[in-house]
Amino acid sequence: AWLAGHHDVTLIRKDCINGFVGAIEPTFKAHGTSHNRCIDWVNAHRLQTIVTVGICTDICVMDFVLTMLSARNHALMPTLRDIVVLEPACATYDLPLEVARNLGLPDTAAHPKAETHHMGLYFMASRGAILASELQGL
């Protein structure tokens, strides 16, 4: 809430796993056209770099970053060069296999924290995101 009133802040309600998809707003519902508040924000401010943080590294953060990379690569944000993931400001959850089974969940519900965090970072970096341990010098 402390940032909500700042003139350089754009708040986008996140109502789905992928914040980029959640930022799509229908303009003319009858015509199926829309715009995206993330793209609008990057373009309005002519941003060259965005920094992404959040929970869960391998789910929400990764989906948003990979979609932003694709949108950038398709020239939807002409000034955007770098999408940075600040690793210390990202995290994910731990759900050991035994706990998943005890809860009556399928084995596929298991979510080993260290491995899935690493996998999320790996996939983002392999597609072009910059992984950073600090923001100094960016």
Language-model segment annotations:
Residues 1-138:
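Active-site-adjacent betaalpha module
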